[in-house]
């Protein structure tokens, strides 16, 4: 199988302030989600954490990207981290606060838009990346983390 390396060329900084190169996730299925603490969909954190707990040992990485692109996120990483831990016991990896649209967007989101036509329209937009770093699909904010269609494709990609 050919490895699509472009995805792995990108890097985030973790919410704790450490380097987070995406190449660390090679060979894993990644569910990339732009998150927000003050959104009507914030309760999706619970489903994302369940996915993380259920599938991390099988090869899934849930990667949260807190974003204020839609004006519903705290302004500091400490507040986001505290909110996520206190309300949802989040243990999956999260990046520092990033823009996911507009001129200040993180380079990965620039690549997703230019190469794949993917642009989050709201918080909790989900993008699934396979073990080779290829974009499988993107799912609207209304697709629940534990929805049948998402779980089916995650399980398929973990096996495949």
Positions of PLM-derived features:
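Acidic-and-aromatic substrate-binding clefts and catalytic sites of carbohydrate-active enzymes
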Residues: 39, 70-73, 145
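Conserved helix-turn-beta segment immediately C-terminal to the redox Cys motif
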Residues: 28-29, 38, 43-66, 85-88
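Alpha-helical elements of Rossmann-like donor-binding domains used by nucleotide-donor carbohydrate transfer enzymes
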Residues: 47-50, 79, 107, 111, ...
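Thiol-based oxidoreductase modules, predominantly thioredoxin-like and allied folds used
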Residues: 59-76, 91-102
């Amino acid at each position: 199988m050919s490895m699509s390396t472009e995805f792995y060329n990108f890097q985030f900084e973790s919410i704790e302030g450490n380097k987070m190169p995406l190449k660390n996730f090679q060979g894993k299925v990644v569910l990339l989600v732009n998150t927000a603490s003050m959104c009507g969909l914030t309760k999706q954190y619970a489903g994302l954490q369940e996915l993380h707990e259920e599938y991390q040992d099988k090869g899934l990485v849930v990667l949260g990207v807190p974003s204020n692109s839609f004006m519903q996120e705290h302004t500091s990483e400490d507040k986001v981290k505290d909110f996520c831990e206190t309300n949802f016991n989040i243990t999956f990896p999260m990046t520092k606060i990033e823009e996911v649209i507009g001129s200040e967007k993180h380079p990965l989101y620039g690549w997703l838009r230019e190469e794949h036509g993917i642009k989050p329209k709201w918080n909790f937009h989900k993008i699934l990346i396979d073990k080779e770093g290829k974009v499988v699909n993107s799912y609207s904010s209304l697709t629940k983390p534990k929805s049948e269609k998402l779980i089916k494709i995650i399980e398929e990609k973990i096996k495949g």
